[in-house]
Amino acid sequence: MVNVVLGSQWGDEGKGKLVDLLVGKYDIVARCAGGNNAGHTIVVNGVKYDFHMLPSGLVNPNCQNLLGNGVVIHVPSFFKELETLEAKGLKNARSRLFVSSRAHLVFDFHQVTDKLRELELSGRSKDGKNIGTTGKGIGPTYSTKASRSGLRVHHLVNDQPGAWEEFVARYKRLLETRRQRYGDFEYDFEAKLAEYKKLREQLKPFVVDSVVFMHNAIEAKKKILVEGANALMLDIDFGTYPYVTSSNTGIGGVLTGLGIPPRTIDEIYGVVKAYTTRVGEGPFPTEQLNENGEKLQTIGAEFGVTTGRKRRCGWLDLVVLKYSTLINGYTSLNITKLDVLDTFKEIPVGISYSIQGKKLDLFPEDLNILGKVEVEYKVLPGWDQDITKITKYEDLPENAKKYLKYIEDFVGVPVEWVGTGPARESMLHKEIK
């Protein structure tokens, strides 16, 4: 059994909380894309665990965890995150964590050039805007992967005669091409090389052939949960390009990032914030640059876990959700942070786009069009009631249930979970047929 948790908007929907809720039922949690450019917090027995790169299945002491071939790995950050989690009391994490030998490596110079590229782009653009990268080197790493010049985990840990010398030569060549492109930026090659010589020994026990790992697990009828990173609207192909990440963050990335066939997928859970947020630049049709947006930002505590940046806030965009559903094929939804809407008398939701009076059939791929669309809203009544202490779906206010029902009917997918507060237990389950 392979079930998948995916973000349906621009990230920060609360995927980690759903994974945390479900993880006790699974034998394996796997990540398939991205790196340490994402982030979420899980609270267990009052202890906060911040996850960026590592699978959040580590909070379950009986669960194995895999970073698949589609993930890009900054090895120093890998160990720093692991050590931070261990210092907070996470037990036997090292024996339950595995890394694909095919995963690509993020180096510090990728991070340096990530920031240089961002400055370059903001200088070129008419409005001074940039992509809004986290500066973690993710984009440049996927770029070297696509150009077939990148280095993978197996290049680093290979013990065969001459393998280390080959790694050094390729590492140096990769650095030189970056310097040719961005100038002679400061980078102590010898010091970094010495660091990686130590890290390779530390990394070796974690490395597996992830294709064999996954297919053995599937054959053994293991219960597997795939933890998506980022979200569909940040997908390199289907998101608001170029204001996207550099990997496939939808269902396609699950298949290619773990090396599994489509027929192995059972359930696909789409995580949806009850309103919409995004970090960084790019069109955002339902954004509220007013008191409503500020209220959503304040009540929702909308700051990025990885960057600390304030998130842009707006009403729920059902055009985005329908588009996301079309591509990812969600079998059920998790609506998160419904409690943030508790004090709104009326709650608009975006239901269609038009431009120059002409209604669009679907989410447009052209950002020049997307930036000019007019949004048609359906205004739904609020419930003006604190729902954070409610423990059963049936006890939600009628207007809250109507809000959820409207979402279900619009996208044609049932809501299975509803987030009603920041606590781990603040998640209501709704039976679906």
UniProtKB/Swiss-Prot annotation:
Pathway: Purine metabolism; AMP biosynthesis via de novo pathway; AMP from IMP: step 1/2
Cofactor remark: Binds 1 Mg(2+) ion per subunit.
Any GO molecular function: magnesium ion binding
One Pfam family cited in the UniProt record for this chain: Adenylsucc_synt
Primary residence: cytoplasm
Binding of IMP, residues: D12, E13, G14, K15, N37, A38, G39, H40, T134, R148, N230, T245, R309
Residues noted as binding GTP in the record, renumbered to the chain: 11-17, 39-41, 311, 337-339, 419-421
Binding site for Mg(2+): D12, G39
Subcellular localization(s) per the UniProt record: Cytoplasm
Cofactor: Mg(2+)
Keyword Magnesium: yes
Example GO BP: IMP metabolic process
Keyword Nucleotidyltransferase: no
SMART domains, alphabetized: Adenylsucc_synt
Catalytic activity: IMP + L-aspartate + GTP = N(6)-(1,2-dicarboxyethyl)-AMP + GDP + phosphate + 2 H(+)
Enzyme class: ligase
Keywords annotated in UniProt: Cytoplasm, GTP-binding, Ligase, Magnesium, Metal-binding, Nucleotide-binding, Purine biosynthesis
An example Gene Ontology CC term for this record: cytoplasm
EC number of the protein: 6.3.4.4
Subunit structure and binding partners: Homodimer.
Family recorded in the similarity comment: Belongs to the adenylosuccinate synthetase family.
Name the record gives this protein: Adenylosuccinate synthetase
Biological classification of the source: Eukaryota, Fungi, Dikarya, Ascomycota, Saccharomycotina
Record gene name: ADE12
